[in-house]
Amino acid sequence: MDGNGRWATARGLPRVVGHRSGAEAVRRVVEASCELGVKALTLYAFSWENWDRPAAEIRELMGLLDEFVRGEIPTLLANRIRLRAIGRLDQLPADVLGNLHRAIAQTASFERMTLTLALSYGGRQEIVDATRRIAERVRRGELAPEQIDEALFVQHLYTADLPDPDLLIRTSGEQRLSNFLLWQSSYAEIYVTQKLWPDFSKEDLVDAIAEYERRDRRFGRTAAAHA
């Protein structure tokens, strides 16, 4: 979800206007994803590094997040969309976190699509947190070091109940992972568009999925073995 600030700056508008337009793009993409049959959609809404932004901008973003979560509950309920959140959520303001937890609880039983908001999230931080949880289990005698493998590690990630992403879309021409789902994106197809996030439309999502479907995903195997 890159480009909110640049979108606003290019129009001579305050950055908060770009963030509000970005929230509208979220609504479009969530609706389009449901229509297209996407089962899991994860949005990088607020990174761990975003805490380094000016305090005033962080307050605006937290207010916008709270407004979005409260305002979208009817849509989530009507479309049977399950809401989740990943990240170091205890860093969020208490009122925002409370409303987020309520929305998550209200939609917990839905299965049409899972919408995950990555908030106060960093891929490196997630791996560190998973490692700490495993180390604590070893310390308590619940695990032996030789029992630790990839499958066990995955169980301690924030995304333990989610599939690995098939497609990673980067807007505004960015060509890096930016600390997003580092473990999970090992074999994700990366699609880069020059569109800034506030301009991202259903048609852009369709184009990204179409490009994904044209790719030959080998997962490290040769073409012959894959066939």
PLM regions and their residue ranges:
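Flexible, compositionally biased loop and terminal segments
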Residues: 1-227
